[in-house]
C-alpha cells in the first residue's frame, strides 16, 4: 500500500505505532495517541475489505462525524445500508465513478458535514446504548418469561 500510494503521489500516514488504546509516550519520547485523537483529523475513513464484522469501526467513524467510503460487504448491505446512512461505497473495486464521487465529496465539505450529521442521528436512532438496552431487556424477558 505504501508503494502504491507513493506511485500515485497520495499522502497516506501509517501511524500504528503511535495510536494505541491509551495515551502515553513511546520509549523514545514520542507521543502515543488514541483513535479519538486521530479521527477528527481524517478527511475520510475507508473500509475497503470485503469481510467485516457488524460495523463497530463504521460506527466509530459515524460518531466522529467523518466521511465514509465503504466496500459494500454483506453485513453493511443487510444491516447498515438500509438504515439510510450517507456513505460513498463501491462493490469490490474502486471505479472511476467511485474516484469522482470521492473527489466531489472532498471538494464539498458542507455536503459531507450534512451527511455526517445525518449519519450521527441515524446511529443514535438505531445503534445507541439505549436501543441496545431495550433490545437486550426484551430478549432476556423472552428467555425468562417475564420483564426484569
Explain the meaning of each model-derived region.
Residues 1-37:
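Nucleotide-activated donor-binding/catalytic signature segment of Leloir-type glycosyltransferases, i.e.
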Residues 35, 55-58, 76:
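Short glycine/serine-rich donor-binding loops of glycosyltransferases
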Residues 45-46:
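A short hydrophobic beta-strand element within the catalytic core of glycosyltransferases
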Residues 50:
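Aromatic "clamp/platform" in nucleotide-sugar-dependent glycosyltransferases that forms part
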Residues 61:
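Donor-sugar nucleotide-binding helix/loop cap in glycosyltransferases
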Residues 67-71, 87-88:
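Short hydrophobic beta-strand element within catalytic cores of glycosyltransferases
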Residues 107-141:
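A charged, aromatic-enriched C-terminal amphipathic alpha-helix characteristic of glycosyltransferases
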Amino acid at each position: 500500500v505504501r508503494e502504491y500510494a507513493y506511485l500515485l503521489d497520495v499522502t497516506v500516514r501509517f501511524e500504528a505505532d503511535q495510536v494505541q488504546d491509551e495515551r502515553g509516550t513511546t520509549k523514545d519520547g514520542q507521543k502515543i495517541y488514541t483513535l479519538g485523537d486521530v479521527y477528527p483529523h481524517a478527511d475520510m475513513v475507508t473500509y475497503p475489505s470485503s469481510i467485516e464484522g457488524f460495523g463497530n469501526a463504521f460506527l466509530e467513524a459515524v460518531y466522529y462525524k467523518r466521511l465514509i467510503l465503504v466496500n459494500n460487504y454483506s453485513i453493511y448491505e443487510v444491516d447498515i445500508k438500509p438504515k439510510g446512512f450517507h456513505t460513498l461505497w463501491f462493490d469490490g473495486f474502486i471505479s472511476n465513478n467511485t474516484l469522482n464521487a470521492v473527489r466531489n465529496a472532498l471538494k464539498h465539505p458542507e455536503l459531507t458535514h450534512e451527511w455526517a450529521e445525518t449519519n450521527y442521528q441515524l446511529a443514535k436512532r438505531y445503534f445507541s446504548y439505549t436501543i441496545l438496552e431495550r433490545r437486550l431487556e426484551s430478549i432476556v424477558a423472552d428467555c425468562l418469561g417475564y420483564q426484569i
